[in-house]
């Protein structure tokens, strides 16, 4: 199939007591009509409560997945890879160039189109001790596992106006190049 996508949930098989929470793989030939690739989740380790990303990486020639998990009580990001979108490596936590313990939600990680040897991400930093503020930050990597994080937000709460509070300042996945 030309298109693949994630769906988060649990198995709906009648009477299934071993149902696991996780990411389900879908496929579509046309991008309009979708079907499950298998009836059980393909990734079950993680929290899956924010933007779960999967994309084909033409440099590594495999699919990459980035999703959320709890790392010693702190919200963080995991990565795993697959050759077929069904069989994934064991997810591992991202590693950072600093020792900051920051809650990270959505990750918006992708290859940077103008320098494809780089990964770029805009994770949402959650600050529960500061009125549950959220702000996107910048991070980059050469291998998709080891990331450099910048401390300053990419978009502060003051720009544009009225972006204060929980769940009010996120960046979505993708970059748009302007002429």
Descriptions of predicted regions:
Residues 1-179:
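Carbohydrate-active catalytic/glycan-binding domains of CAZyme proteins
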């Amino acid at each position: 199939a030309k298109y693949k996508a994630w769906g988060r949930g649990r198995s709906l098989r009648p009477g299934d007591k071993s149902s696991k929470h996780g990411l389900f793989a879908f496929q579509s030939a046309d991008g309009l009509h979708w079907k499950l690739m298998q009836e059980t989740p393909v990734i079950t380790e993680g929290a899956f409560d924010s933007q779960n990303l999967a994309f084909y990486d033409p440099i590594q020639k495999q699919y990459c997945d980035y999703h959320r998990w709890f790392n010693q009580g702190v919200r963080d990001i995991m990565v795993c890879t697959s050759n077929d979108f069904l069989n994934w490596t064991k997810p591992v936590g991202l590693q950072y160039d600093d020792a900051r313990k920051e809650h990270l939600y959505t990750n918006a990680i992708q290859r940077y189109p103008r320098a494809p040897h780089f990964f770029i991400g805009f994770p949402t930093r959650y600050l529960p001790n500061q009125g549950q503020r959220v702000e996107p930050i910048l991070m980059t990597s050469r291998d998709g596992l080891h990331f450099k994080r910048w401390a300053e937000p990419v978009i502060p709460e003051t720009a544009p106006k009225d972006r204060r509070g929980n769940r009010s300042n996120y960046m979505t996945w993708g970059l748009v190049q302007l002429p």
